[in-house]
């Protein structure tokens, strides 16, 4: 009987320790620098003073165009923004942490390649904090979109 109690106690402690190790994410886990999916840029995810999370291009593998001048946001549909530098551009905006869903919702992601901004949410699949998944979609329909994966730079 004493042996059964000891085994039960050890098993209970093991389950508690296992639950502790697989604890849920916290909002600031997204902060850090990532390679984009194409491995052409580093994007730094950070928490702004307003409590939302943003992503800014901090490094470009090829920062200049063929003419040797810094790359610009030439595909932007807003004529006033076409001349802004790609380096330093904020492309992920206003993501809000949702504890219950374990993801950052209600943000937008700007794709400099096509000049379009998409509704978006971001998350770590299976708690893997080295691979940030971004789901961009249109018309509020999450199934009508594309998922991209950014890799954390350590």
Where is each model-derived feature located?
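Short acidic, glycine-rich loop/turn motifs
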Residues: 36, 109-113, 136-140
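Positively charged n-region of N-terminal signal peptides that target proteins for export
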Residues: 1-4
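N-terminal helix-cap/turn-to-beta initiation motif at the start of protein domains
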Residues: 21-33
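Bacterial N-terminal signal peptides
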Residues: 8-18
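A mature extracytoplasmic/lumenal domain signature
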Residues: 38, 47-49, 57-59, 124, ...
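Edge beta-strand at a domain terminus
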Residues: 129, 138-154
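Conserved interaction-surface patches within small, structured recognition/assembly domains
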Residues: 121, 130-135
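Central antiparallel beta-sheet cores of small beta-barrel/beta-sandwich binding domains
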Residues: 31, 42-120
């Amino acid at each position: 009987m004493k042996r059964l109690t000891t085994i039960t106690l050890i098993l209970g402690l093991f389950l508690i320790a296992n639950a502790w190790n697989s604890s849920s994410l916290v909002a600031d886990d997204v902060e850090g620098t990532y390679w984009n999916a194409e491995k052409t840029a580093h994007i730094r995810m950070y928490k702004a003073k307003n409590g939302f999370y943003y992503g800014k291009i901090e490094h470009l593998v090829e920062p200049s165009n063929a003419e040797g001048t810094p790359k610009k946001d030439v595909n932007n549909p807003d004529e006033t923004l076409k001349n802004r530098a790609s380096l330093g551009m904020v492309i992920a905006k206003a993501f809000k942490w949702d504890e219950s869903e374990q993801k950052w919702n209600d943000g937008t992601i700007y794709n400099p390649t096509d000049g379009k901004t998409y509704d978006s949410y971001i998350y770590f699949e299976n708690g893997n904090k080295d691979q940030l998944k971004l789901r961009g979609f249109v018309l509020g329909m999450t199934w009508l979109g594309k998922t991209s994966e950014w890799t954390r730079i350590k």
